[in-house]
From Swiss-Prot:
Record PROSITE patterns: LOB
A Pfam family matched in the record: LOB
Protein family: Belongs to the LOB domain-containing protein family.
Membrane-traversing stretches: none
Cited InterPro entries: LOB
Domain of life: Eukaryota
Protein name per its UniProtKB record: LOB domain-containing protein 21
Residue stretches making up the LOB domain: 10-111
């Protein structure tokens, strides 16, 4: 998807797929070149050509390329994960981030314990000031999680479960 490049005489991907004549005013042509047939097929399957046409008509022209890029990405993810789509990918990344922050905090704490440095002198979370500030408020052993437990591993596992939609 390259935007507003001069068109060749061939039809755009949308008109090819929909088996219609591509006109000079085709709203799909600048965004779905004839070589983007698979991309348009995915967008059409998930959103429908009529809905995409209406959406592109409502979006300012300078934002249409980004709109098409977003639709193509969302269609791709929705076809891979029909139930959760992008939300499932976001939840998975958030879970991974929490696991890595936890692992980093544990590793730094162990490193400090083995180095003989007093824990009050150095924070194991120097690179994560937001998390460090939160954990400094409450001792780790007394940390109450959102689900009411103190078991961080179980909590991280629960975060990894797909969200209820």
């Amino acid at each position: 998807m390259r935007g507003h490049e001069p068109r060749s005489s061939s039809s755009c991907a949308a008109c090819k797929l929909l088996k219609r004549r591509c006109t000079p005013t085709c709203i799909f042509a600048p965004y779905f070149r004839s070589s983007d047939l698979i991309t348009f097929a995915k967008v059409h399957k998930v959103f429908g050509a009529s809905n995409v046409s209406k959406l592109l008509g409502e979006v300012p022209e300078e934002q249409r390329q980004e709109t098409v890029n977003s639709l193509a990405y969302e269609a791709e993810v929705r076809l891979k994960d029909p139930v959760y789509g992008c939300i499932g990918a976001i939840a998975s990344l958030q879970k991974k981030m929490l696991e890595l922050q936890h692992d980093l905090a544990v590793a730094r704490t162990r490193l400090l314990a083995h180095s003989g440095v007093n824990n009050s002198q150095v924070s194991p979370l120097d690179d994560s000031p937001e998390l460090a500030a939160f954990l400094d408020l409450v001792p780790y052993s007394d940390l109450m999680l959102l689900d009411g437990s103190t078991n961080l591993d179980a909590y991280l596992y629960d975060l990894g479960q797909p969200p209820f939609v």
